Amino acid sequence: MTTTSANVGETLSRSETSTPTAGVPQPARLASGGLIDRARSLPFSFDGRKLFGHPGDTLASALVANGVKLVGRSFKYHRPRGILSAGPEEPSALVELRSGARREPNTRATSIELFDGLEAASQNRWPSLAFDLMAAGSVFSPFLAAGFYYKTFMWPASFWEKVYEPLIRRAAGLGRAPEGIDPDHYEKAHAFCDVLVIGSGAAGLMAALSAARSGARVILCEEDFRLGGRLLCERGLIGGEAAPEFVQRIEAELRSFPDVRVMTRTTLFGTYDHGTYGALERVNDHIALPPPFEPRQRAWRIVAKRCVLTAGAIERPLVFGNNDRPGVMLAGAVRSYLNRFAARPGRRAVVFANNDDAASVAVDLHAAGVEVAALVDPRPETKPSSVALAEKTGARLIAGGVVTGAIGGHAVRAVEVREANGRSSRVACDLVAMSGGFSPNLHLATHLGGRPVWDETIAGFVPGDTPRGMAAAGAARGTYDLADCLAAGAKAGAEAADAVGFQTRPSAVPQVEPQSAAVTPLWRVRGHKGKAFIDFQNDVTDKDIELAEREGFRSVEHLKRYTTLGMATDQGKTANVNGLAVMAEITERSIPQTGVTTFRPPFTPVAIGALAGHARGKEHRPTRFTPSHEWAHAQGAVFVETGLWLRAQYFPQEGDRSWFDACNREVIAVRSRVGVCDVSTLGKIDIQGADAPEFLERVYCNSWKSLPVGKVRYGVMLREDGFVFDDGTTARLGPDHYLMTTTTANAAAVMQHLDFCHQVLWPDLDVGLVSVTEQWAQYAIAGPKSRELLEAIVDREHDISNAALPYMACSEVTVLGGLRARLFRISFSGELAYELGVPCRHGDAVIRALMQAGQSLGVAPYGLEALNVMRVEKGHAAGGELNGQTTAQDLGFSRLMAMGKDFIGRAMSQRSALLDPDRQVLVGVKPLDPSARLSAGAHFVPLDVPVNPENDDGHTTSVAFSPSLNVSIGLGLLKRGRERMGERLRAVDALRGTDIRVEVCPNCFLDPEGARLRG
């Protein structure tokens, strides 16, 4: 996996002294080497302190180069924390990036590309990072063990919300959420390829190269801003050239292929069905502000025929006392800062590792001029290579020993070492490079439910059943030797291309020196001093695991939730295996027997804005305008959002003091003259086919085969559970042709439901369905003069008299000299009324013609408020009554239900609970005091009984002031309501503080005989 060659070349050469570069002092910057641009300096700030770095740095490497070790405080105990890793697995160095509305909390310093003017701040501290008063809480740490919130702060109970919870919330947490609306823009994009390669380390580069040479369409995703992965940290040779030069050559060849897309700064965060992957591209996160009209980030939906997972492996920390102190780092991270960034993490180091791979860090430290004080190897046998390494670096070799604890506060000063003979000693140091082995980065291989498999040879989990079309290679598969990684990647890329029809052979693998990553597991150091952390981000220690086991939380998923192991923003990348191993050790089970936790997307945190793309604010969903919108806007209409639609709520005129006056005026106009309302938002579904009548019989609870052509019928649709789903009218336009209308709110849901019924339940029926909601403009023309108005625009050859077009009839007509239209004699207002449908492109012209023709009749436009008042006056059920909890019987539709046939919801509608006579049913209510105003949601309580849940008999669902009756009226659901006509109740609205006496009455307040609508 790494190389120990001392041949470095100019690109990664090292000096033993640190000197300022580009005239800017950076006390821990090596004098030469690294993949940074020393010709330029980038100013940045950390906690208000101005510092400098170079292009090619991350924030973490720049902090290391400036000698900054303390970068944060821990989640629960507020312990000093430094930088642990050099990649996306970082659990400790979490900072706030930027400020104001662009502030981004909990950002990993190791993944932030340094840019000019970068602002970063530590978090979870007060008043300062160096002096955090909240750290005093460590005194109470015995009371803050795993699950403490279930066992402490329980008395007195009244203190929880007012005292305990606020204190806990103030003490815990990490960053602060941004203030204000996010000013940045985001995009969503789609990509398609033959082969997707995830990760650009040794295996990833070879996989992409093999696939690209075959002619396949290849996408190579790398979350870093450079390709190469751990090759960027290597000091050895690959095929005779320095590792970074090898990476540059392969990258240049990949970019030369027209069908290869190399995507740096792009994280694959999720694996989904059918070869679909989610990726986040950080388009402009590496600069202070995105350029105008460019996104900050872009969310990709990538569809790949084959995928090669070459995401590498994550180094595990060792579990010993105070292993979280600043200056205690992963060995691989130390190599990264030395070799890639030319930043020295310390001056005197102790290397503590249980595997051969960590020998490389000792060589690199020595080459960089860092004194290697000790090599602590817990393995009992002493290898000749270890002796040679100690001699080369001048380090003391402590074979069979362990580090029991780190000593220091804001930075490590020394370590306590227990040797094989039991003797303890102290070794002074300011850097501990630790390595507990490696865990293959297999998260993406398990997102679809695949379970990883334990591999004893590497002491880690490897991918088991990978998603269809995915293959893992290299370190992600548990292969750590560099030569084997190169070969495995080349083979996997060639096989992926071959599987999709491209003939190729694996690319030739360059020669490299053989390596060893042999590991002897050490899951924790026994007898350690101080807290030994397993999950650094959530402050979970080995003692927490022991406590969870004692309290019965031995299951992996229980352990995870009780201790919060692996539940932080890093998802336990460095913690999970160690936590499982400690539980296995305590319970005397193997790790496979203990189990493995479930990995879920996203792999790393993803900004919500990126997932939304342009769909934010008013663009969250498209706004739909009615055909008469421009005309209504010109009339000064006030609009209201109803679902996705923007509808006219009312039309204010001179003299109207408020919406209330405008609404009353519009209602009176309809009741006395004629009004026009745009009802195009109602769902309209065109149904055709020989089996259309049978289809309607099954989806509606009432009968449809008997409906004649040219007639309209009201219908009620039930859900499978027997409750009312939707209602509306359906017109029979021809023997096999129907037009169904739905409520505005349920238009999409009903269409989806009908499609399901057709395609899944009854695919044998000869019927076709299509939504025509946006193809037809529909206007309600209501009032005693509505026929006169229509006669002015309907062409004379069409007879629309009461005899020719009675109530609930429909007809094809032409208007305005030949314009095709549909006329329906239906009424929602209770007046003589029609609905006129015309092709949508003519909707604006028709509304203008109607208003022009109706001037002599006193025509008035009316909006949603007046429409609602008139439907309450007539007792029609709508949204408040169709709440998903009412049955057809509750709403008075029992006679509609054709129980002699089968229909959706029939069986469940006959359940005893739904036929209970005590159910709440639809009634009308009016106040005893005509001046009182009812409110929706008021609860019905019998007179002279306490107001409590036991005496709650129902509630009002819709209320309105009726200008026709000059009184407030309402609809409601009342227990045994039909038996209680004339009874007096209290309508109690505790929220608004009202208590009104009402009388129960029929739900139809106006013209119950229907004489007006049949006139």
Predicted regions and their residues:
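Acidic, proline/glycine-enriched N-terminal capping motif
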Residues: 578, 585-718, 723
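Structural motif
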Residues: 46, 97, 642, 720, ...
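Well-ordered mid-protein domain cores that form the structural environment of catalytic cofactors
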Residues: 705-736, 740-756
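Residues forming the flavin
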Residues: 2-49, 53-623, 775
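Conserved, structured C-terminal
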Residues: 629-634, 647, 734-736, 742-1015
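A short, contiguous, amphipathic alpha-helix enriched in charged residues
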Residues: 61-71, 690-707, 788, 792-797
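Residues forming anionic-ligand binding surfaces in small-molecule and nucleic-acid pockets
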Residues: 221, 313, 553, 664-680, ...
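Short amphipathic beta-strand starts and helix->beta connectors
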Residues: 457, 517-520, 665-672, 717-727, ...
